[in-house]
Amino acid sequence: MSYVIAAPEMLATTAADVDGIGSAIRAASASAAGPTTGLLAAAADEVSSAAAALFSEYARECQEVLKQAAAFHGEFTRALAAAGAAYAQAEASNTAAMSGTAGSSGALGSVGMLSGNPLTALMMGGTGEPILSDRVLAIIDSAYIRPIFGPNNPVAQYTPEQWWPFIGNLSLDQSIAQGVTLLNNGINAELQNGHDVVVFGYSQSAAVATNEIRALMALPPGQAPDPSRLAFTLIGNINNPNGGVLERYVGLYLPFLDMSFNGATPPDSPYQTYMYTGQYDGYAHNPQYPLNILSDLNAFMGIRWVHNAYPFTAAEVANAVPLPTSPGYTGNTHYYMFLTQDLPLLQPIRAIPFVGTPIAELIQPDLRVLVDLGYGYGYADVPTPASLFAPINPIAVASALATGTVQGPQAALVSIGLLPQSALPNTYPYLPSANPGLMFNFGQSSVTELSVLSGALGSVARLIPPIA
């Protein structure tokens, strides 16, 4: 019987709120430092000089107190996040023990402890986030790191995270290359200090981690870090083997952006890796069949509604769906998907007051079927470039559309209150699926007509000097 009730997400949220207090402390300290510690004497007499010196000394003491308050805040924030993660990990372990699923592939059920040395979590941000705040470190740690790897020291790893002409002066390739050097230095420094390391990467920094993994795998035997001392957690990975845009159009090169489509994160990496992808994320879950315009538009909208909105509570991450890998796969990467209930394509309609949600609910089930026809939903570990023609199973599609025709009006009536919440449909296509079974399975090729074309175009484009 359990006598303690804890809400890990509330602890993580509280940690985030406390971090806001710390930001205010730092801002107050910075604002007060100049005007108060360098007071000038009101006049040239001894009394004025003594008064100015006295108040300047008080100001310096106040600055020291503010520094100590800021340091205390940082430790308190990390302690709150650690408590939330500890509760989440304990709850997951208890649940697994009671249900007999301790060896399942669920994110919280697979505790990926490293060698047992003190653990450092090097965390990187996405484009436009070169250094993560204490608040974000605490949230990521609570949701993605501690539930799997246990207690650690979260460290913000600086990387440029630029993408000219949108953000900064570095092209995407330049930003990633500099990020790899910085990350490699950070990893080596921690390993040399006797620490194990888990690297967290999101979006562009997941590409940084991908290139670092490749570089480590290319080292001569004995020079790469021991796999028992290094691991990776990647979300919104643009190099995702089955869905990342840099793999969908592998070989392509855009000289006007200095952007290389350099393929998949190695599925045969010796390093323990946890990869999380949001369904319909236009960067990490890009359509396999781009002739499906609805899928393309939905993925484009998914950049805003999915890629920028990954879950950040331990409970949400624990509900990620494990994705199947190819028969006989013995790699060290675990693949998960966050299912997306509301199609990004319909989000603007949902924003219409009063009528938006009923309209979206009415059309979403059948629209989901049409959007899902742009995806092959093959094995997660197989690098899968884009292809032209989808092997559609017409019987499965007709059945799903027929079901959606009934589910849409039913969901719309629930949304306006004419039916109870219990009447909401509880099957596909109203609910999302990691594999709706709309395609014939003719295998999963890593070479397609579009990959050959994108590779050829990339070779020609590299003859053009990059603009960035």
Swiss-Prot record:
Domain PE-PPE: 154-375
Induction (free text): Expression is high during exponential phase. Induced during hypoxic conditions. Induced in the lung and in spleen tissues of mice during the early and chronic stages of infection.
Family of this protein: Belongs to the mycobacterial PE family.
InterPro entries registered for this protein in UniProt: AB_hydrolase_fold (IPR029058), PE-PGRS_N (IPR000084), PE-PPE_C (IPR013228)
Protein's name in the database: PE family protein PE3
Upper classification of the organism: Bacteria, Bacillati, Actinomycetota, Actinomycetes, Mycobacteriales
Applications reported: Could be a prospective candidate for the development of subunit vaccine against tuberculosis.
Keyword Cytoplasm attributed: no
Function: Plays significant roles in mycobacterial persistence during infection and modulates host immune response.
More about this protein: The immunization of mice with recombinant PE3 protein stimulates the secretion of TNF, IL-6 and IL-2 cytokines and generates strong protective immunity against challenge with live mycobacteria.
Entry keyword set: Cell wall, Secreted, Virulence
Places the protein is found: Secreted, Cell wall
Record-linked SUPFAM superfamilies: alpha/beta-Hydrolases (SSF53474), PE/PPE dimer-like (SSF140459)
